[in-house]
């Protein structure tokens, strides 16, 4: 009964936010303040468990099936440092006929890059027979003219960019790659492995700090960055289940996650590897409502930083969930 009630609240809020088309979602709140009701989801139970030491409580959670093989989760987590975090997760099972695909603007070529907001890019990528079911932002971006992603970009087997545009002022960028091989396997590796791997990668973007490698939380994450910020990251298990994370930050009530906390979440989910992507005002997750068919912005983007956020930032690359 509790799960049914939670689902009905989720559907009502989700649908009401979609009446005006693509829009920014406000964090959904529980219908009751009875703490003992939560967590209600299996993933919430995992995140509250011993495998995720940086999360001490799940204050609220819910889940919704977007399409077979794709589940959406939303949580309010309480961290070891007593920070409340609005957190969003996608669970993608490629064995159910889904795949992760890199999205770019229609105007982008290997020589000229363009940026686009996610709701527009998702609409442009969608067809009647194969809509984009979900999308998150991709790699970091070098905003100097002409703009370009920090790392390599492969889309549907075409190499749009290779190599890395690194900057000593942004040492946490241009450190890795996230890819999908031609046989559908997820892969994450450091920059030095890209050249030998690139011919095997159907989809690929660059990435930042590697959070998990071979099931181990990587050392030195505190050295890289102790700050709280909005975050986007991707991890996967040994059986190729993909977890996509977005966390709100830079506004009252949810300041953002640290690298250590992100790594702890992916470790709790049993991920073999996980990597950080672009964050800050770039962090965004959109999901297609299965009832209305409209795209919903699930999180609360932090731009503009001098206000209360809620504005999409244009990005050169994204990761989309579509049918194979």
Residue ranges and their predicted role:
Residues 146-165, 220-236, 241-271, 282-324:
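Conserved, well-ordered active-site substructure
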Residues 18-169:
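Zymogen propeptides
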Residues 137, 141-223:
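Active-site-adjacent helix-turn-beta-strand microarchitecture at beta-sheet edges
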Residues 96-97, 139-144, 194-195, 249-252, ...:
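Solvent-exposed loop/turn segments at secondary-structure junctions
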Residues 133-137, 177-179, 187-189, 233-235, ...:
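Structural recognition of the beta-strand scaffold that forms the well-ordered cores
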Residues 1-4:
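Positively charged n-region of N-terminal signal peptides that target proteins for export
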Residues 14-16:
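C-terminal motif of bacterial Sec signal peptides marking the signal peptidase cleavage site
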Residues 76-79, 85, 89, 206-239:
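Conserved beta-alpha junction segments in alpha/beta enzyme cores
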């Amino acid at each position: 009964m509790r799960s049914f009630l939670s689902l009905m609240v989720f559907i009502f809020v989700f649908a009401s936010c979609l009446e005006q088309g693509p829009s920014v979602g406000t964090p959904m709140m529980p219908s009751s303040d009875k703490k003992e009701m939560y967590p209600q989801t299996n993933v919430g139970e995992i995140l509250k468990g011993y495998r995720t030491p940086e999360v001490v409580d799940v204050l609220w959670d819910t889940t919704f099936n977007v399409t077979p093989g794709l589940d959406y989760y939303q949580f309010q987590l309480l961290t070891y440092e007593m920070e409340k975090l609005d957190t969003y997760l996608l669970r993608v099972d490629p064995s159910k006929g889904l795949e992760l695909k890199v999205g770019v603007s229609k105007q982008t070529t290997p020589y000229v890059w363009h940026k686009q907001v996610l709701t527009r890019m998702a609409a442009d990528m969608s067809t009647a027979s194969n809509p984009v079911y979900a999308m998150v932002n991709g790699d970091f971006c070098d905003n100097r003219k002409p703009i370009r992603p920090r790392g390599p970009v492969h889309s549907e087997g075409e190499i749009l960019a290779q190599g890395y545009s690194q900057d000593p002022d942004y040492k946490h960028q241009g450190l890795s790659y996230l890819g999908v091989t031609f046989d559908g396997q997820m892969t994450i590796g450091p920059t030095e492995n890209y050249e030998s791997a690139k011919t095997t990668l159907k989809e690929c973007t660059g990435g930042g700090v590697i959070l998990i490698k071979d099931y181990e939380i990587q050392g030195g994450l505190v050295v890289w960055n102790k700050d709280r910020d909005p975050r986007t990251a991707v991890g996967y298990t040994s059986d190729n289940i993909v977890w996509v994370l977005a966390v709100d930050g830079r506004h009252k009530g949810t300041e953002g996650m640290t690298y250590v906390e992100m790594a702890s979440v992916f470790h709790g989910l049993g991920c073999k590897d996980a990597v950080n992507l672009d964050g800050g005002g770039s962090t965004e997750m959109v999901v297609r409502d299965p009832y209305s068919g409209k795209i919903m912005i699930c999180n609360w983007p932090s731009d503009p930083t001098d206000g209360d956020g809620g504005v999409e930032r244009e990005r050169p690359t994204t990761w989309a969930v579509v049918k194979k």
